[in-house]
Amino acid sequence: MKVAVVLIVVLVVMMIGQETDSWRIRIRRGRKIFRKIRPYIPFVIGAVGKRQAGDAEFQAKYNAAAEDGVFTDEEIKSVFGVDDNGFVEFKATYDVDGDGVVQVEEYETVVELTENLAG
């Protein structure tokens, strides 16, 4: 019985050793691959770039609608381009206090929280 326990302990130690060795190989391979593609990363980022939150036309419409601090139903439909079904979902998502009016502050808070949760 003691011999069996010793053999099991030895096998477990050997298995752990094999697992760490296999992780080391994977990490080393990952480092080699990263070293090969690292010089090209700035070119890819420069070509694709980080997408802006919106284009100039959207930004102009948004700023005009946000001047009074409240998005009216017509402003929501024209600025965000939602139809009647999307309008109901938009109100349900961005009307935080449930008063039937989407305020700019509510909209920006929900967008910021969503971006933070998305990463």
From Swiss-Prot:
PROSITE patterns associated with the record: EF_HAND_1
Positions of the EF-hand domain: 82-117
Organism superkingdom: Eukaryota
Calcium found in the keyword field: yes
Alphabetical UniProt keywords: Calcium, Metal-binding, Secreted, Signal
Signal peptide from the UniProt entry: 1-22
Location in or out of the cell: Secreted
MF annotations from Gene Ontology: metal ion binding
One cellular component (GO) term of this entry: extracellular region
Classification via InterPro entries: EF_Hand_1_Ca_BS
Binding site for Ca(2+): 95, 97, 99, 106
Expression sites (tissue/organ): Component of the acid-soluble organic matrix of calcified layers of the shell (at protein level).
Official protein name in the record: EF-hand calcium-binding domain-containing protein 2
